[in-house]
């Protein structure tokens, strides 16, 4: 196992409901990547954008070689095939690790899943299968999964997928909420890359903003 290597997999919603947040999403993602390029240790990045289908724009690319995402890659459209995106990514990364030499397997693997709506278009995977896959990777290999959801009950949805409450958070699907997401995720990645246990406080800024502004709206 390669101690200073971290596998980071981003599964990002680009379905039609994300319309209007393209610039915020692109800017937040790029700022996070630039910050992580300066962090110690090695990291491989995979980025899957999903709507009706999944598109892989980075497949285990050295983080220092990641070029800024643009609106050519992140253009919103279609429905929300979330389960297909998660299941396909787990299957791919799991196979890579399975057949890699011991010294090529990352010490840490983190999936970051962001969606702003309900699953409504998957055909290859269902929630039971995805839950089984996530629980297997967590228990056997220590993989971590973060779930950030807007316009849904993110904590309850994450539970259906085998992701614990302390790894799930509700956020506001707007400019402020999107920025906080990427800032918090970057801190979580830094913690994981350093080998420190991930604190449940990783989501505190997102949660505080969500509760404050939800109260204002109510």
For each feature predicted by the language model, list its residue ranges.
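Acidic, low-complexity intrinsically disordered regions
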Residues: 1-218
């Amino acid at each position: 196992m390669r101690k200073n290597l971290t596998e980071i997999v981003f599964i990002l919603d680009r379905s039609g409901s994300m319309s209007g947040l393209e610039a915020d999403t692109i800017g937040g993602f790029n700022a996070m990547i630039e910050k992580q390029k300066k962090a110690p240790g090695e990291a491989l990045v995979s980025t899957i954008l999903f709507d009706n289908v999944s598109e892989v724009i980075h497949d285990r690319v050295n983080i220092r070689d990641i070029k800024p995402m643009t609106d050519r890659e992140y253009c919103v459209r279609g429905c929300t095939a979330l389960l297909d995106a998660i299941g396909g990514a787990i299957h791919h990364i799991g196979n890579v690790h399975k057949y890699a030499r011991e010294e090529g397997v990352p010490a840490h693997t983190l999936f970051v899943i962001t969606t702003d709506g309900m699953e409504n278009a998957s055909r290859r995977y269902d929630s039971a299968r995805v839950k089984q896959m996530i629980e297997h990777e967590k228990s056997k290999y220590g993989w971590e999964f973060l779930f950030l959801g807007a316009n849904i009950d993110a904590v309850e949805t994450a539970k259906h997928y085998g992701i614990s409450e302390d790894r799930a958070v509700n956020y506001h699907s707007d400019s402020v909420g999107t920025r906080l997401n990427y800032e918090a995720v970057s801190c979580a990645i830094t913690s994981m890359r350093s080998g420190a246990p991930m604190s449940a406080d990783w989501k505190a800024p997102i949660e505080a903003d969500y509760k404050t502004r939800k109260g204002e709206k109510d």
